[in-house]
Every structure is written in C-alpha cells, then in structure tokens.
C-alpha cells in the first residue's frame, strides 16, 4: 500500500517538498542500479597523453557512428564523486588505463574501488589498456569487475596499446566502437520497455489514488460497472 507523499527527506542531501515525482524516480533507479541514460562514459588514466588520445579517438568514432550521448573524463583531474555520479547515470562505461608497476594506474584503481563500495551493477564495460614491456591493466580491470561488480558485462573487443596508438590499433578501435554501438542499440530497446512499464505503473497508481477518493457509493457503482463489462453485458 502507498500513502500520499508530501515531503521527501533523503538521509544525505536536501529535503524535497516540490516536484517529488522527479526525485523519487531518480532514487528508485539508483536503488535498483538502473542507468538513468543510455549512453557512454569514457574514463581514462593517462601518464603521457597516449591513453587520453585513444579515449578521445573512441569518443569521436562513437559520435560518427551515431552514439552521441558520450562523456569523456580524466580520472586524474575529475574528483571521484563526479565520476561516481556519472557512472550511476550512464549504461556503458569504458575504462582506459595505462599499466603502472604491473598494476592498474592508482587513480583508476581508486575509481573502481568507489564503484565497488557503492555496489554499482548492471553496466556494460569496455576496456582500453596501455603499457610498454608488460601490459597488465586491461586484464586486471576485467578481473576487478568480475570479482566485485554484480550483473555487469565486459565487451570482448578490448583495445591494447603498446605505449602509443599506431595504425595497427585502428582495427581494434573500430571493433571496440562497433561493439559499443551494438550494445547501446540493444540497451535502447530495454530503455524503451522500461519507459512503457513506468508509464503503465504510474497510470495504475493514479487510478488507485483516484479510486480511494471516491465515496463508498461511487466505488460500488464503479465495481458493478466493471463487473458488467467483464461479463460482456
């Protein structure tokens, strides 16, 4: 059963007294880890600019192929609180990281840690890795996702860069962007269905609320009419 809501008081954040439907919808999605938007968040950790160049090239190629809801962030310059908010917003996340001492670059690892402690789930991940003599960041990021983030999918089209991207990486970049475009198209259908389901739920809730406002006599008359319609009278 539901009761009329006049005020929404989250544990962390302001108290909302107006436009409650908007904020309740946001919290409903966040609590179920459902993305707010079907789009791509590209997060990169770059030491000398080469991983950044690959991330920007991917963003440009996605836009050329029709996926324009794309955001690109430097994990070294953007505070993790903003990155987490965007991770909850978008359906697809691309992690682009250089290898650092046979590990994930520290600021990227910190970002992943925050996703873990906040239980982010139900996302599609793409991977770009970079390194020189021992490229490990990609496999380590995949392992971290598999072990710590629930109900997430990792695209098979990983891009591997040896220090800086060259012509041989063009096919990998193309394959990764194609995989993301295909996945976004699939997710779009799921988004459309959720919109339909949410609208149906809202309509049913409105109908229930209107029914509760009726007098006992009006309710009985409405129920009798519904019964007659069901019998085909």
Task: List each language-model region with its residue ranges.
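Conserved beta-strand elements of the Class I
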Residues: 39-43, 126
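Short, charged N-terminal beta->alpha structural module
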Residues: 43-65
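A short acidic (Asp/Glu
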Residues: 20-21, 53, 138
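Flexible, glycine-rich phosphate/dinucleotide-binding loops
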Residues: 17, 49, 79, 134
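Cofactor-binding loop segments of dinucleotide-utilizing enzymes, especially the Rossmann-like FAD-
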Residues: 44-47, 75, 129-130
